[in-house]
Amino acid sequence: MSNVVVMGAQWGDEGKGKIVDLLTRESDVIVRFQGGNNAGHTVLVGEKQYILHLIPSGILHEGKKCLIGNGVVLDPEVFCREIDSLRAQGVDMSPARLMISRKTHLIMPYHKVLDQAREAHKCKDAKIGTTGRGIGPCYEDKSARIGVRAADLAMPELLRSKIEAALVEKNALFTGLYGQQPLDADAVFEEVMAHGAKLVPYLADVSSEIHDAWAEGRSVLFEGAQGTHLDIDHGTYPFVTSSNTVSGNAAAGSGVPPTKLDRIIAIVKAYTTRVGAGPFPTELDDATGEYLQQKGHEFGATTGRKRRCGWLDAVVLRESVRLNGPTDIALTKLDVLSGLKEISICTAYIYRGEQVAYPPQEQNGMAHVTPVYETIPGWDDDITGCTTWESLPAPVKAYVLRIEEITGVRISLVSVGPERDQTIRR
């Protein structure tokens, strides 16, 4: 039995969906433990592409149980739409194999209105590039102890009272600060309950489900969303998400003790990407950056926004290792680098006149660093057909081993293409 946490080591979009899909074969239960539908996992199965925003990608594997933990914020409308879409494609979406924690907080219609109004109201330099999905405002209400939880859907009077109380404050903001029309409490209640009727059968005690699985000797895979450097505490604040994306939150966001987590896999893209605003020291605003963007199909699964591209940043990776304690690394999109004569790796920053090995912790400090690069030979070979470590060209292996050396973490999986079987185990 193995309990594995999969988390992103950069700014998200590292290719977690494919790796989770691969590891799901070896797991019995898959748990999503944080974030909301601001993240998207793209999974390619044969000729069919699935984009999942809330439901764990393990749902595509027959016989696997998928759980949504208390650390997630869930939009009932999006959840119901995702269920309908997957069911239409022949996926079993019964409550016996998909469950939501009763403690999971719900993204309400007023959260989305507030998120979008707040971002639109900011001056250009203050915008953080939110997806406008209501994630942040939902987490705000959770911390303020005024949020709506999934269990409230089964208690209509409690739900109605929470909505009415929330709109006293939210409508004051909408009308007084943002010039928006107020929301009607009855209309919000009816909208939420319409989706809630479909959602209630999926409610469960997720913590107990996981512990029961362990008691039966089954293995659990904890599926993270986004990436370490979008973490609310440890990321490039304020250009971050509203939850903890580091491996430690797998326990808190699922209702299990951290001593049960025995393997942590950090997903690392072979180059670096970022969506939206925020510092990006190794960003390439040139032909090489465009090459990576086009060849890597770097468009956000959730927003469709073009991802910014740059060289691999080992400073960021060192910090990720320090924060997450990974047992091993899965390196993705290595095939995208084929065709480049030289490849650069950022091994340090110059910050305030000194060379540093870790990111500065001051707000906006990352915007004022100069990357220090080392350059190694690239390769022209098409590696998408390679199936073993030995079959990879020497320059490819040298690049992988250099990343391993810099991070001090073994690279156990190397992805050389989007398909499930285009993955090399070491």
Swiss-Prot record:
Cellular location(s): Cytoplasm
Keywords in alphabetical order: Cytoplasm, GTP-binding, Ligase, Magnesium, Metal-binding, Nucleotide-binding, Purine biosynthesis
Cofactor detail note: Binds 1 Mg(2+) ion per subunit.
Gene3D superfamilies assigned: Adenylosuccinate Synthetase, subunit A, domain 1 (3.40.440.10), Adenylosuccinate Synthetase, subunit A, domain 2 (1.10.300.10), Adenylosuccinate Synthetase, subunit A, domain 3 (3.90.170.10)
PROSITE patterns: ADENYLOSUCCIN_SYN_1 (PS01266), ADENYLOSUCCIN_SYN_2 (PS00513)
Gene Ontology CC, one term: cytoplasm
Principal place of residence: cytoplasm
Pfam families the record matches: Adenylsucc_synt
GO biological process: 'de novo' AMP biosynthetic process; IMP metabolic process
Keyword Ligase attributed: yes
Active site (record annotation): 13 (proton acceptor), 41 (proton donor)
Single GO MF descriptor: GTP binding
Residues involved in GTP binding: 12-18, 40-42, 307, 333-335, 415-417
SUPFAM superfamilies: P-loop containing nucleoside triphosphate hydrolases
Protein EC: 6.3.4.4
Biological function: Plays an important role in the de novo pathway of purine nucleotide biosynthesis. Catalyzes the first committed step in the biosynthesis of AMP from IMP.
HAMAP family reported for this sequence: Adenylosucc_synth
UniProt xrefs under NCBIfam families: PRK01117.1, purA
Family, per entry: Belongs to the adenylosuccinate synthetase family.
Record's subunit section: Homodimer.
Protein name: Adenylosuccinate synthetase
Name of the coding gene: purA
